[in-house]
C-alpha cells in the first residue's frame, strides 16, 4: 500500500461514493487536501475563537461576538468535514451526508459565508488566521466545483474557432505580423519623420 493510498484511506468516510453530487471528478490530492485543510482550519478557528472570546477582559463586545461566531463556524466545518469527531451526536452523519449530496459550490459558498463575519467584526490575527483557513477551504471547494480545465488541444481548437470579438471566425486569414492590429483598417504609426500636424515649435 502506497503512502497516497494510506492518506486517502485515513481521510475517506465509510461507505463514501465516488462523486455523489455528479460533479466533475477532482484529483485525489485536491479532494482529500481540501478535507484536511477544512479539519485543520476548523481546529484553529475553534482555538482562535476561544482566544477572541477571552477579549471580554478588555470589554470588546464585538470581538466576543466574533469569537463565538468563529467557534460555531469551526464546529460546523469540523462536523461536516470529519463527522467521526462527533460520534456522540447522531444527526451529524446525516447532516454531512446531505451536504455531500449537494454540489460543491454549495459547500464553497457555505464555508466562505461562515468565515467572513468574524473577520469584519473583530479584525485581528486570531480572527484572520482562524476564519481565513475556513475561507481558504471554501475557495478550494469552489475551484473543485469549477472542474478541470480543458486539454491544450481543446483550448487551441476553441481559440481558432472564434476571433477577438467572440464571434465565429470569418473567412479572412489570421495574421501573425507584428504590425497587425485589432482594427483591420488601422493605419500604422510613422516611425520616421514628424507627425503631420506638428508645428515644429
From Swiss-Prot:
Channel activity is inhibited by La(3+), which reduces Ca(2+) influx and thus inhibits it's function in promoting activity-dependent bulk endocytosis (ADBE) in response to high stimuli. The keyword Ion transport applies. The keyword Cytoplasm does not apply. It is a multi-pass membrane protein. It is found in: Cell membrane; Cytoplasmic vesicle, Secretory vesicle, Synaptic vesicle membrane; Presynaptic cell membrane; Endosome. Its main location: membrane. The chain crosses the membrane at residues 37-57, 59-79, 103-120. It comes from the Eukaryota. GO terms for molecular function: calcium channel activity; identical protein binding. The record marks 81 as: Calcium ion selectivity. GO terms for cellular component: cell projection; endosome; presynaptic membrane; synaptic vesicle membrane. InterPro entries: TVP18/Ca-channel_flower. Belongs to the calcium channel flower family. This is Calcium channel flower. It comes from Drosophila willistoni (Fruit fly).
Amino acid at each position: 500500500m502506497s503512502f497516497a493510498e494510506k492518506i486517502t484511506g485515513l481521510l475517506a468516510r465509510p461507505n463514501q461514493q465516488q462523486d455523489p453530487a455528479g460533479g466533475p471528478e477532482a484529483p485525489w490530492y485536491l479532494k482529500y487536501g481540501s478535507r484536511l485543510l477544512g479539519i485543520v482550519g476548523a481546529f484553529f478557528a475553534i482555538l482562535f475563537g476561544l482566544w477572541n472570546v477571552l477579549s471580554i477582559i478588555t470589554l470588546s463586545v464585538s470581538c466576543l461576538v466574533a469569537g463565538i461566531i468563529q467557534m460555531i463556524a469551526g464546529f460546523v466545518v469540523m462536523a461536516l468535514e470529519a463527522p467521526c469527531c462527533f460520534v456522540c451526536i447522531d444527526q451529524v452523519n446525516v447532516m454531512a451526508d446531505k451536504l455531500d449530496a449537494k454540489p460543491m459550490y454549495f459547500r464553497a459558498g457555505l464555508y466562505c459565508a461562515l468565515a467572513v463575519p468574524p473577520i469584519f467584526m473583530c479584525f485581528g490575527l486570531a480572527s484572520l488566521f482562524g476564519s481565513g483557513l475556513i475561507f481558504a477551504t471554501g475557495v478550494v471547494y469552489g475551484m473543485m466545483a469549477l472542474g478541470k480545465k480543458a486539454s491544450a488541444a481543446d483550448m487551441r481548437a476553441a481559440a481558432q474557432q472564434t476571433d477577438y470579438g467572440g464571434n465565429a471566425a470569418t473567412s479572412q486569414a489570421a495574421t501573425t505580423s507584428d504590425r497587425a492590429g485589432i482594427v483591420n483598417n488601422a493605419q500604422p504609426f510613422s516611425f520616421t519623420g514628424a507627425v503631420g500636424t506638428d508645428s515644429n515649435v
